[in-house]
């Protein structure tokens, strides 16, 4: 065995300096690049052929490993921050957020407790408090950054169930129920499955909006079994905003936890163009918003905010002898507020970006996407062979081409990516195939979108 092999990976040596320089050089080039291609996936067989085995007893070396990543693995990944990545909900992290993500890893930070990470917890909490204020929640509101909307929704709904259990005492129903729109995000059903509770989906009208009349009927039907009503502030498929104010008004007659799934759309509250559409959010018991979607942070981050953080803490604090020094303290430990213990301070890139550029820059960037969605919606209506499925509410634009089948949309989508013109995957609504632009990147232009529409002629 080679002398000092046990410490080779951790000492500062010429090898260490070289690999750090390699990684920083690549990161600098990628962050400052202005012509990064969309790229495209390839097959497992092809990746194995090109890369060969990389995990061996002796390793392939840092230079070879980075070369494999840069020239083989990375080109097999679609570039999610490309201005013409318009599928799902894209990610467009700011340059500051991307750069600071390196700092977070380099600093060996733990973001689970105040004891171990007071500085970063303070920074994250400043962002969470600012968001809570933007959403109209009280100064006492607070929460934690988790992995994504699925984790955020699950953590909030677990807290809601815990609060309902404490409220009812021994009078527990046979099955707990979550009330939500039939168009709610799939993560709500996923959370219910993990929690072993039922979902009561409420039908919407043609506009896809969850309204108080349907929620009232569900509350009457299920009574105390309801642990939460989930309203969506910007559905993934259309950007539809439920009637949150009307649903919140039901709290005058019914006692329920109101959770707002704003993973994509709630960020639009920062824009003066859309703020008025979110009336009622201030009455929520919990909300989520994903900074890696429309707040321009890197993957992955979801801000989970409780109206009363103590309810989140009671539901999620983990207890063990070795944790006594943390759990017996009244200091703010983020791991007490979600289904996690070990956590990276994933809110820091957003903090650095907000601190660097200021909130007004964020408002302008979000407004750009909303304006662009309205502009391209108008353009679509001018084209005789295209039709809007719904008027754009935020920055998602859904449209159909006359006489196209699902196969036509798929061929068109495949051709766009093959030609490196755009990444637009087909979608559907009520069994009808369609096309969909999800616009969050401030570098996406009207001309970009018109160019894509022209390929449908």
Where are these regions (language model features)?
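Active-site C-terminal subdomain of aminotransferase-like
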Residues: 279-384
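Short, glycine-/Ser/Thr-/acidic-enriched flexible segments
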Residues: 183-185, 206-207, 234-236, 265, ...
